[in-house]
């Protein structure tokens, strides 16, 4: 395996620097499949309540995917990332009335909370869209006009179960009965558990029934369109059932806080259709330039809105003559001590408190390290402290401190690598050879780590990418512990070459870890790489040529002065910061 790894690096070296890129050599690992542009989106978040950690988790997943793509494909012009707020609908209309505010006043207030949270959490979005913006109204009404011109909308009586909380109609199969507070049967949504009522009114209706087979073909031809796989299969299963036509408007007398149907002020466009079009608004729809970004789109969404994004939205796009999005990444939810977050339970965790308590990078790392898209993840404060102290403070921070401490590295430089001490061929012997079999396993693991991590990002398994990095950090600590550089003497002709080699290998490993952690912990990674003396132009995946001296090539860092010591990489969370994060009660 080591010889294969060496050949992999050396082959690319013969063709020049640009071919030594771990992240961009393999399209399957990059996730871009050769596309020149990439457009990442979060859902736009409903402004009926303050943001919670589930909202932040969606934004962090998108942010990490986007940042990793920027490491692979330098140049901000090729990557776009949007988030924002969903501000129309009956719930906003009612919440504003209850608060004694105009709807736009409520929207301004809560949208600002989301914007502030994302700034504090270092979400690197390029666009923040609000559905109350004039540009969005233009896009929605144009999109409606295209559907109408294509004969896909008709006016009729729509009758069925309506869920006010979810603002959607439900077929009979998606409704069940539960015993209500009065002891009587109460109809509720099977999917959300929210109450439903029978509603009959005249609406505009979209011919969704025409798109069942086109959607099945789309998913059949694009097996990675929806990730993870269980959600892809769930959508295929939904499509085995009949797709009834879909109401896409409400009476203006009932819902006035929204975008009017063009040419018919008696109807307001349904909030979920209005909201979905935001992805087109951001890239300039209906102007022709939007096609340079569409459909190179990756939607990051929660599982509760899967049907809207994986059935309704692709059908609407196909109906408008547009291609469905490139990828839909789906994640599950966060619970608190095993319970769903709820204002009524008083267990909604305030993400801004967590960012302050555990640091921005610490809380980013926790959510992305512990969050598994396939199933719900449980939050409790002790878990945060244990993870961050173990992996960031002790393992990673301790490794950096060991290798840069004055006692072990008095010159404050990137020491030289001695090929005689650490030959590239395992099993060689000689008076200078001190390497052990486990050390070759470490080199192989770290050399292949960037490609492994790229594959995990492509598969929407960021938690596995961080698990792989953490595993290599542990291996590197084992390497340092095994060879105990603090017991070696720089003044000894026998010790000095091996001491320099041990530190060189460990610092090279740290450089890889710092580079790969940039999408998740940008500030911590910057601090680590700056301490190693790695300039900002040497931090992309194209520059991540690991341990070149091992393969007989020059190392640009050898002999370079380390950067300034700015203190602990990540201080352990002391008792004053381990108090339970109080629930944000509203």
Curated annotation (Swiss-Prot):
<dbReference type="GO" id="GO:0006431">
    <property type="term" value="P:methionyl-tRNA aminoacylation"/>
</dbReference>
<feature type="short sequence motif" description="'HIGH' region">
    <location>
        <begin position="45"/>
        <end position="55"/>
    </location>
</feature>
<keyword id="KW-0030">Aminoacyl-tRNA synthetase</keyword>
<dbReference type="GO" id="GO:0005759">
    <property type="term" value="C:mitochondrial matrix"/>
</dbReference>
<keyword id="KW-0648">Protein biosynthesis</keyword>
<feature type="binding site">
    <location>
        <position position="343"/>
    </location>
    <ligand>
        <name>ATP</name>
    </ligand>
</feature>
<keyword id="KW-0067">ATP-binding</keyword>
<dbReference type="InterPro" id="IPR015413">
    <property type="entry name" value="Methionyl/Leucyl_tRNA_Synth"/>
</dbReference>
<feature type="short sequence motif" description="'KMSKS' region">
    <location>
        <begin position="340"/>
        <end position="344"/>
    </location>
</feature>
<dbReference type="GO" id="GO:0005524">
    <property type="term" value="F:ATP binding"/>
</dbReference>
<protein>
    <recommendedName>
        <fullName>Methionine--tRNA ligase, mitochondrial</fullName>
        <ecNumber>6.1.1.10</ecNumber>
    </recommendedName>
</protein>
<dbReference type="GO" id="GO:0004825">
    <property type="term" value="F:methionine-tRNA ligase activity"/>
</dbReference>
<dbReference type="Pfam" id="PF19303">
    <property type="entry name" value="Anticodon_3"/>
</dbReference>
<dbReference type="InterPro" id="IPR033911">
    <property type="entry name" value="MetRS_core"/>
</dbReference>
<comment type="similarity">
    <text>Belongs to the class-I aminoacyl-tRNA synthetase family.</text>
</comment>
<dbReference type="InterPro" id="IPR014758">
    <property type="entry name" value="Met-tRNA_synth"/>
</dbReference>
<dbReference type="InterPro" id="IPR041872">
    <property type="entry name" value="Anticodon_Met"/>
</dbReference>
<dbReference type="InterPro" id="IPR014729">
    <property type="entry name" value="Rossmann-like_a/b/a_fold"/>
</dbReference>
<keyword id="KW-0547">Nucleotide-binding</keyword>
<feature type="transit peptide" description="Mitochondrion">
    <location>
        <begin position="1"/>
        <end position="46"/>
    </location>
</feature>
<keyword id="KW-0496">Mitochondrion</keyword>
<dbReference type="InterPro" id="IPR009080">
    <property type="entry name" value="tRNAsynth_Ia_anticodon-bd"/>
</dbReference>
<dbReference type="Pfam" id="PF09334">
    <property type="entry name" value="tRNA-synt_1g"/>
</dbReference>
<keyword id="KW-0809">Transit peptide</keyword>
<dbReference type="GO" id="GO:0005739">
    <property type="term" value="C:mitochondrion"/>
</dbReference>
<keyword id="KW-0436">Ligase</keyword>
<dbReference type="InterPro" id="IPR023457">
    <property type="entry name" value="Met-tRNA_synth_2"/>
</dbReference>
